[in-house]
Amino acid sequence: MSGNTLGTLFCVTNFGESHGPAIGCVIDGCPPGMELSEADIQADLDRRRPGTSRHVTQRNEPDAVEILSGVYEGKTTGTPIALLIRNTDQRSKDYGNIAQSFRPGHADYAYWHKYGLRDPRGGGRSSARLTAPTVAAGAVAKKWLAEKYGTRFRACMTQLGELPIPFESWEHVPHNPFFAPVADVQAYEDYMDALRKSGDSCGARIRVQATGVPVGLGDPLYDKLDADIAHVMMGLNAVKGVEIGAGFASVAQRGTTHGDSLTPTGFASNNAGGVLGGISTGQDIEVSLAIKPTSSIISPRESIDIHGQSTEVITKGRHDPCVGIRAAPIAEALLALVIMDHALRHRAQCGDVVQAVAPIPAVRLG
């Protein structure tokens, strides 16, 4: 299986399966000399980990990260950084009834046809469990970017199923299980309680933002920053759509509205989402993700087995009724990995380029 490594200079290779002994990643290309400990990584893993509320899977994994290499006396050495997260709460017996059949909407069918076999335990390699190493690697990228450029990452949920979530303040996001930017989440609690009792699942919309991104990241024509962001975000489990800036709303805009006016004191708007011509402008990078409903649900559905015969599928086990609830820290990590890689690439080719006129300030839109 190829397709497990992302990045050109900051390369991350992800390994493991949902019910294997461990999952992890190897980071190659991290600059030397940065202070790094497990604690620097664990904070983001704790934001993503399962079992933190009744609205997510009750699989109780501590997701404790171990740094196996690439750090000496508390600093990165420039050699590959190996990160390991041990699986401790697998329950493979829950998947015995679907070992010979395919879950509608799941990767089961495609994996089986492509590779000739599949690991049904928790989805194997296709499981969202494999996003934990991504978050770990993203934490390393976040730390370097924060120290080098002051870049910061944050994400929130802007829609849960049919329910839009109005934006009030980023300050609310850490204080509720939905990563919602609102003070009162009772309506979303009630919605998820009813959904879980019905045996169904729902999708979500996630907003991801990077602030303090330097001007100049991205390599046209085919390695544009926004192209790489979209590419990597589509690799996140259950993502079915990616928008940069105004995204699909651009269709209904006029050029007089969509084009972000430039003034000596800053951009007047940010419909471009921080990227023009595939290159960062210094504006906030704005990304929106559409996440489909979870495919592993207890409601009976029609499918076929590995012999092509009709069957009924009921998925047991512990699953997220909405995978979007835990997607915010994962999306932050993926955005950080793309920006980190492009920052190193920009430094390698254009690090000596100096403009007499400083970049204009970014507009703050919330």
Curated annotation (Swiss-Prot):
Function per UniProt: This reaction introduces a second double bond into the aromatic ring system.
Recorded catalytic activity of this chain's protein: 5-O-(1-carboxyvinyl)-3-phosphoshikimate = chorismate + phosphate
UniProt cross-references to InterPro entries, sorted A to Z: Chorismate_synth, Chorismate_synth_AroC_sf, Chorismate_synthase_CS
An example molecular function term from Gene Ontology annotations: FMN binding
Single GO cellular component term: cytosol
Functional pathway: Metabolic intermediate biosynthesis; chorismate biosynthesis; chorismate from D-erythrose 4-phosphate and phosphoenolpyruvate: step 7/7
Name this protein carries in UniProt: Chorismate synthase
Binding site for NADP(+): R48, R54
Signal sequence annotation: none
UniProt EC number: 4.2.3.5
Residues the entry annotates as binding FMN: R125, S126, S127, N237, A238, G277, K292, P293, T294, S295, S296, R318
UniProt gene name: aroC
Entry keyword set: Amino-acid biosynthesis, Aromatic amino acid biosynthesis, FAD, Flavoprotein, FMN, Lyase, NADP
Cofactor needs: FMNH2
A matching Pfam family: Chorismate_synt
Keyword Acetylation on entry: no
Family (UniProt): Belongs to the chorismate synthase family.
